Amino acid sequence: MTKVIVQGKAQGTVLKTNNPINFLGAVDKKTGIIHDQKCDIFEKTVKDSILVFPHGIGSSVGAYTIYSLKSYESAPLAMICKKADLTVASGCALANIPMIVVSKEQFDSIENGKEVEINTESTTILN
């Protein structure tokens, strides 16, 4: 089952982590680089990726960090989560970044580094 949170289209390379992301504390809004040493995508950039992660954590100010990522042209092309939290959903809506929520099975089947396409207007949302 796939649920659309923010509509849109995107195609790109998956950057996947099994760690929740704290956008306010862990992501550099100017570069998109992950600075959380506990995260398995430490020192990778979310810029121009299809960012796949379980859910967001931390302050609601993280929504503005997501918006800032877009303003600095360092944002992911789309986000895929297992659970929609208010911070990430709000940030994606503000920044107009497509966001979908997928089942655990779908999440587990998405491979890091794979090229994927998201089209929320299609019957097949995730290819």
Predicted regions, residues:
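Feature captures the catalytic cores and cofactor-binding loops of soluble hydro-lyases/lyases
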Residues: 4-6, 10, 16-124
